[in-house]
Amino acid sequence: DKSLILVGFSGGFRRSELVAITRDDIEFVKEGVKIFVKKSKSDQSGEGMTKAIPSFKYVEFCPVDHLKHWMAENRNDLVFPISDKNVALIIKKHALRAGLDEKRYAGHSLRSGFATTTAEYGASERNIMAMTGHKSVDMVRRYIKEADLFKNNALNKISNE
């Protein structure tokens, strides 16, 4: 589950994209991992796109390290051999374990969480769209607006003193 969640979040994947990843779609490189997405909701022609996920400093949360270990232990051609509906169930299960309301989380939470979190840390619209494959700036701006609710909150000066 951890590999699926870390890769899904770090790549801003749709759940259908995650469960379609095969071993041939993955290339480990010095900087991290490149994952080729053959087809997605916004790419019906099947042009495909490559998502690059860098290695993280902290191994415990590194999607690249967890993916390497997962693939070494599991020899399936499909990297995550589950249905897209099971992705949602896994997210809900771990949200509940973390003490969160599982009804507020689903498979899309990985993708929306990526967009919101990277916006909070200052990623540009263009960079977020390059990773998620969004065609609409308006959709990405929704995530950024949500992130800005706290980042640019007028109470930050008071609450941090």
Where would I find each of the regions flagged by the language model?
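Catalytic-site neighborhood detector that most strongly recognizes the C-terminal catalytic loop/helix
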Residues: 132-157
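Conserved tyrosine-mediated DNA breakage-rejoining catalytic core shared by Y-recombinases
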Residues: 11, 16, 20-61, 69
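Basic, Lys/Arg- and aromatic-enriched nucleic-acid-binding interface segment
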Residues: 1-15
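Residue-level marker of regulatory loop/turn positions in helix-turn-helix DNA-binding domains and
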Residues: 7, 59, 83, 107-108, ...
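Intrinsically disordered, low-complexity basic tails/linkers immediately adjacent to helix-turn-helix/homeobox/MYB/SANT
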Residues: 159-161
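The alpha-helix within a helix-turn-helix
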Residues: 8, 19, 129
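Short, basic (Lys/Arg/His-rich) helix/loop patches that form interaction surfaces
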Residues: 73-78, 88-130, 137, 149
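Major-groove DNA-contacting interfaces characterized by cationic-aromatic clusters
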Residues: 49-96
